[in-house]
């Protein structure tokens, strides 16, 4: 058959067929992502979600997951638009997405919209503003300086205790423990059992992780009840004798009617769960990068002033939380996708942070990246993470200690990432140090 000359009707039709095939392929990819829960919840995507995020972004910014009421939002602009529309998208955590044995996604129901357990990051204004104001009083510059002294001393003790024959299991010895020690000090707990608090705090987030077996769910529920009982006991003690700490501040706020007791107690549970979890994940990811990328480790050692840029790039590259949920108040649209009332968004920080429309070469770890704090790992706007400054402080102290006490760190054994669609934390990181 004679080939049609360039520009002839035959050539135009041939070009149109190729375009239609490409569009059809893209649509098929979109439908696969949207309908197959295994794609989103599977082990491959849990351990390395970024190739999936890239395919999702290429097909669209908003994806319905497995015919459920959950929509994943993966584009930078769409995520930011959702954050900026609180009148349409509530921060209340009314349900989380879970993976079933049948390979489908279903909701794990939480408190309904406007319920009393929505605090801090999961509260809407005006309640959110009240919660934030109470906590921020204890995260002011003066208090941060006191916490800095405590953190330096605590990190030193954990380092000495964790080092054995030139090795340290970083997550168990330092990353999981230090943030919980800092949270306990901030709240004002007397003689806390840190190992127990870590167990309880992680149990609280395990309920939300989406990949939990029934027996794990039951155990996590029991642990959360134990943590709640402990918090209630400490709160009663503080109410009888308020001290100059967050616990005393909350007790005083309840006595004055500014806050109800249940809300104050849930706020403390949330600080343990989210505050400990997020900083532990940051400390784990940062040291994993240093230990597995000797080129980056050498740059930071040779140029100590790069430590701040390293921390920010770590936050962009591996956000401590994969994302956060939003509740769709009324039927609306986001980036052209129709969203029914009472459906849910999962705003994927990790996907937004690697959107090539926002970041040059987003899959590369760069210490010279412009606009270092331009990532969205700590949220944005009214819900910008209340503990961001404290988390950065802990990271700076711990990483400075690690680099000052060693000449080389290597990863002797790296465990997998926590099976979770909410948290991005390495489970085990054995370091060999010189």
Curated annotation (Swiss-Prot):
EC number: 1.14.-.-
Keywords: Heme, Iron, Metal-binding, Monooxygenase, Oxidoreductase
GO molecular function, one term: iron ion binding
Residues that bind heme: 132, 326, 383, 385
Cellular component terms per the entry's GO annotation: peptidoglycan-based cell wall
Required cofactor names: heme
Protein activity control: Inhibited by azole drugs.
Enzyme's top EC category: oxidoreductase
Leader sequence segment: none
Highest taxon of source: Bacteria
Gene3D superfamilies associated with the record: Cytochrome P450
GO biological process: cholesterol catabolic process
UniProt key word Heme: yes
Binding sites annotated in the UniProt record for substrate: 124, 128
InterPro entries tied to this protein: Cyt_P450, Cyt_P450_B, Cyt_P450_CS, Cyt_P450_sf
Disruption phenotype: Cells are more sensitive to azole inhibition.
Family statement: Belongs to the cytochrome P450 family.
Record text on subunit structure and interactions: Monomer.
Protein name as it appears in the record: Cytochrome P450 144
Organism listed in the record: Mycobacterium tuberculosis (strain ATCC 25618 / H37Rv)
Gene transcribed to yield this protein: cyp144
């Amino acid at each position: 058959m004679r080939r049609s000359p360039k520009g002839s009707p035959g050539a135009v039709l041939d070009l149109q067929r190729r375009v239609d095939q490409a569009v059809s392929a893209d649509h098929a990819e979109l439908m696969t992502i949207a309908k197959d829960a295994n794609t989103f919840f599977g082990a491959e995507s849990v351990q390395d979600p970024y190739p999936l995020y890239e395919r999702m972004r290429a097909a669209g910014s908003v994806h319905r997951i497995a015919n459920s009421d959950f929509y994943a939002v993966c584009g930078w602009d769409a995520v930011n638009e959702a954050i900026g529309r609180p009148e349409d998208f509530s921060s209340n955590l009314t349900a989380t997405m879970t993976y079933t044995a049948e390979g489908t996604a279903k909701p794990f129901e939480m408190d309904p919209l406007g319920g009393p357990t929505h605090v801090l990051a999961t509260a809407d204004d005006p309640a959110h503003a009240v919660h934030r104001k109470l906590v921020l009083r204890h995260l002011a510059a003066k208090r941060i300086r006191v916490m800095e002294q405590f953190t330096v001393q605590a990190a030193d003790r954990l380092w000495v205790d964790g080092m054995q024959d030139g090795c340290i299991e970083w997550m168990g010895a330092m990353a999981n423990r230090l943030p919980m020690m800092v949270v306990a000090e901030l709240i004002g707990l007397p003689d806390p059992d840190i190992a127990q608090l870590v167990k309880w705090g992680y149990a609280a987030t395990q309920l939300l992780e989406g990949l939990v077996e029934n027996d794990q769910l039951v155990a996590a529920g029991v642990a959360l009840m134990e943590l709640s009982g402990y918090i209630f006991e400490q709160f009663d003690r503080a109410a009888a004798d308020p001290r100059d700490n967050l616990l005393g501040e909350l007790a005083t706020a309840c006595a004055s009617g500014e806050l109800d007791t249940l809300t104050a107690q849930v706020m403390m549970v949330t600080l343990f769960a989210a505050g400990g979890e997020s900083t532990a994940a940051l400390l784990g990811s940062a040291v994993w990068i240093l230990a597995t990328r000797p080129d980056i480790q050498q740059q930071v050692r040779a140029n100590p002033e790069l430590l701040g840029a390293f921390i920010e790039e770590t936050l962009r590259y591996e956000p401590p939380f994969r994302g956060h949920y939003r509740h769709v108040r009324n039927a609306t649209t986001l980036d052209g996708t129709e969203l029914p009332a009472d459906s849910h968004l999962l705003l994927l920080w990790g996907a937004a942070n690697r959107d090539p429309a926002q970041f040059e070469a987003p899959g590369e770890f760069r210490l010279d990246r412009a606009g270092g704090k331009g990532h969205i790992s700590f949220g944005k706007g009214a819900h910008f993470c209340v503990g961001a400054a404290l988390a950065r402080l802990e990271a700076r102290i711990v990483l400075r200690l690690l680099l000052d006490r060693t000449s080389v760190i290597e990863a002797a054994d790296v465990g997998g990432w926590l099976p979770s669609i909410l948290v991005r934390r390495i489970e085990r990181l054995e370091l060999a140090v010189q």
